[in-house]
């Protein structure tokens, strides 16, 4: 398995995260993918189920072929995490030969057990870091991604509060940026680049900012309403 660094962008819909992804992907050796509809969450549920049932059963009894949960006592935590990482890198991340930093941005960080999910990602991708992107919530709620939902401003407020609360447990593994700030003055991104250990290239950043990103949102069935 390659010695890659991993960075994940945490945000919500219509926060300007596609632009942020473009900024980060302008760094040589970076390859962050876009959204995957929270696909890693399914792997978290898989792993969490295996670990929970392993802890629940009596290992002496569950190791017997006459037990209804025969074999779950041997659920291999380390192997599971290794295979989950291999699957994610082979399917979702697909790093190029020259990729140094891999990851993705996602807008679906609204689960009640978000701190546990983040801890899982840290197990799967040791040393991974998170960039938490926020935006003026009134502007977010007014976008067509949210206006068809019940209480759009209340929803994005609750999502942001949950992300910020979970981020408190990440310590130095998370860095927050605010869309309105870096669009008004890209120089504020120097702090992010310093935290990442990357060179801030002013010309490259301005080229990205001058390039249109994203597109008008379409209403999608299945997006969670909070």
Give the ranges of each region predicted by the language model.
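PAPS-dependent sulfotransferase catalytic core
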Residues: 1-87, 202-204, 208-226
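Catalytic alpha-helical scaffold of carbohydrate-active enzymes acting on polysaccharides/glycoconjugates
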Residues: 80-92, 165, 169
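Short boundary motifs at domain starts and secondary-structure transition points
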Residues: 1, 90-96
